[in-house]
Amino acid sequence: NCMALCEHVLAMAISDGWDNFFNNLQQIRYKDGIIGMRTRNHYTMADWLPENSWILEDVSRKVGGEYTKSVTRTISHKKFFTSKGIKDMRYVLPDREITIEYVPLDALEEVEKNIRPGDIVALIYTNKTDVFSAHMLIIAEKNNKKYIREANSKKATTFDTPYKEWASNIQDLEDYLGLSFMRVKEELDVPGKVILPWEISKLKSKARSGSK
């Protein structure tokens, strides 16, 4: 699915072999790398991005500039897990009111120049009160032209759409507000950069302390 695509691409980009890939994938996909339904980073903007702040940063405002807007919603893990038939609520986070930033759909063509290949994108719902992200995508570039890369779960593959075409096609869809943008941190966005699994704890500590 869309989140799995982004997780796999991110993990492969920082790994030098399959062993490191699977370890890094585990760190990206689960809180503190602990495999489990309740430790999975289910919510893109409330879980996945914050838990991966050691490698990613929210660049929605950098991309959107003056067009950037914000939206606040309450995220309930308890409600989510209850809907999945899970009764054991140990280690489940309490309900949280979270505010995120996004670039409105009608500004997407204006901000294309600020988007980089490799940016991870979340498509934000309009009317949902308990979730932000409807879909995750990746910005790709071929022959100096930007594309939106998406996962097709039914066909178990990916497909690319020219960015301008994608942005134009989505303008009239009232279900969505806009896009939030995530980007690999500058100091880690180095060709051939490998992050070993045991280095991640230091990067997480650095991210939590706010140090550079």
Residue ranges of each PLM-predicted region?
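Active-site-adjacent substructure of cysteine-protease-like catalytic cores
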Residues: E110-D130
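Short alpha-helix capping/helix-loop boundary micro-motifs
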Residues: I100-V111
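Short, surface-exposed coil-to-beta transition loops
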Residues: V131-M136
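Generic detector of well-ordered alpha-helical segments enriched in charged/polar residues
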Residues: F22-Q26, R90, E109-E112, A167, ...
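Generic preference for flexible, low-structure residues
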Residues: F22, N41, V59, L137, ...
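Low-complexity, Gly/Ser/Thr/Pro-rich intrinsically disordered linker/tail segments
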Residues: P117-I120, A140-A156, D160-K212
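Acidic/His-rich structured neighborhood in mature extracellular/periplasmic domains
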Residues: N1-I98, R116, L123, N144-K145, ...
